[in-house]
Amino acid sequence: MDSVLLHEEAEGYIQSLEKMSLRDIGSPRWFRQHEFIEKLNMQAILNASANQEEFIKDLFVSLGKIPTLVHAMILTEVWKHKVFPKICKLQDFNPKSTFLLYMVIHHEATIINLLETIMYHKESSEAAGDCVLDLVDYCHRKLTLLVGRSVSGEISTQDRITHTQISGTASVQDLQKQSDMLEFEISIKALSVLCYITDHVESLSLSVLSRMLCTHNMPCVLVQLVENCPWKRGTQEKYTEGKWRAVLPEDQLKLSKHDGQVWIALLNLMLKPDCQRKYDFNSFNKTQLLKLRGFLTDVVIDQLPNLLDLKHFLSQLALTDPVAPKKDLILEQLPEIWNNIVMENDKKWKAIAKYQVTNVFNPSESELREQASRLAQTYNLDVMENLIPDKPKCGACGRTGVKRCSRCQGEWYCNRECQVKHWPKHKPSCNLMAEAFQKLQEEMKISS
């Protein structure tokens, strides 16, 4: 299997990662660190999918750089909330290329993807230290956003244009739309990270447990996800492997990965003794949790047998009123990253936006060519093929794909009929990707 990084290269990349300021976002130093994280993410996925030694995870743990990764992710999140909207409102901002802006928007997704891979392991949660609290808060923000958009019907069923497809000529308004679509993907990854944190809750501080159960009432958030199931569109489509895909008739009752993660997180937060002692089973929480009984069918339990224990627990809960937890006087740690970033930059958002528009997001032709060249090296398509865990699926019907779109090389089909049927939906992304590849090739020719 192809490799993105050798062990020694990865160690150098991880050792060089540093915390940056909001003003630094998009700078050459930031862009170089973004490239490092992209490559580390690719290598981590390659190792995990091939059941190889996960040296990327080991290096992040041993070098103590997981907090740096979490800080970079939340820094980008704050930038997207506070600075990006102000950039979009600047009427005199007409950049030659919006590509660098998209890289910043995509940065958060890259990091949560990397965290999804490395936080699967208990030692990663332990090595994250106090920033697990920040990670819990981050996951809560994303999951409540996911529930809210699902309830209001705001979740787009279009596939997002990826970083290898985006055209440098896309408008700022196009980027806003892509950013909104990317939030859904990020929220799905945040669910994975939360699930892994609940797996390792015994080895984490009581503050983490209190944050999940008392501050954020995560069990009730998870109940909302079971009820609304934002990764399903009726019985026809499911969101899997980063795309909306048609569901085969024989798979309609099958639990998806995301369904399983919600149930596992509920099992961890409801059945572990420390959690039961900490959680307040008041009348509201009890009513919410008992809604789960309607979803615990024999078909579901057959796929996740441990859910039988949850079903028994809920039956017992329906007949009893658990004693409220003791409110002991304890000192609890609090998450700091989001609040510190906001406090440091309060009332400076517009000034930062103007500075970045002038000095960062309006690069010269030579700078654009250099970025295009480095991008081509980072996103090695031969290596990226190996990041797909299973055989490619037909974009129209969901069965195994055997041929890909000859124009963009980004979508697979099982036969010509499916390709023709799917063309109206695929055409916009196909055009963007074809234009991006053509533009990249032209810039590479100019630079050489």
Swiss-Prot record:
Its main location: cytoplasm. Zn(2+) 1 binds at residues 394, 397, 414, 418. GO terms for cellular component: apical plasma membrane; centriolar satellite; cytoplasm; dynein axonemal particle. Transmembrane segments: none annotated. It is found in: Cytoplasm; Cytoplasm, Cytoskeleton, Microtubule organizing center, Centrosome, Centriolar satellite; Apical cell membrane; Dynein axonemal particle. Zn(2+) 2 binds at residues 405, 408, 426, 430. One of its GO terms (biological process) is motile cilium assembly. Disulfide bonds: none annotated. A zinc finger (MYND-type) spans 394-430. Disruption phenotype: Ciliopathy phenotypes: appearance of 3 otoliths, kidney cysts and dilated kidney tubules at 2.5 days post-fertilization (dpf). Motile cilia in the kidney show disorganized cilia bundles with either severely reduced beat amplitude or paralysis. Olfactory motile cilia are nearly completely paralyzed. One of its GO terms (molecular function) is zinc ion binding. Belongs to the ZMYND10 family. This is Zinc finger MYND domain-containing protein 10.
